[in-house]
């Protein structure tokens, strides 16, 4: 049985690390543009549970996954292979 490396993107939602192309900040103009395009193409996945979107994960299938975790937090999780949920990383508002 093969082992898959996964990334917890918040609230128990996971993404296969091998499918991630990039992780970008959600507040740039280009991020907003590709987010609107993905929404119109039905390729937008919202994993924020209604919280503020802080990062956008782009996959190799051109799907966009919205996360409430910061880009830096997601990168740290990938680098350390640590997918435990720290309370300061998830916005509880």
Swiss-Prot record:
Coiled coil: none annotated. It comes from the Bacteria. Disulfide bonds: none annotated. Pfam families: RemA-like. InterPro entries: RemA-like. PANTHER family: REGULATORY PROTEIN SSL2874-RELATED (PTHR38449:SF1), REGULATORY PROTEIN TM_1690-RELATED (PTHR38449). Belongs to the RemA family. This is Putative regulatory protein LBJ_1616. It comes from Leptospira borgpetersenii serovar Hardjo-bovis (strain JB197).
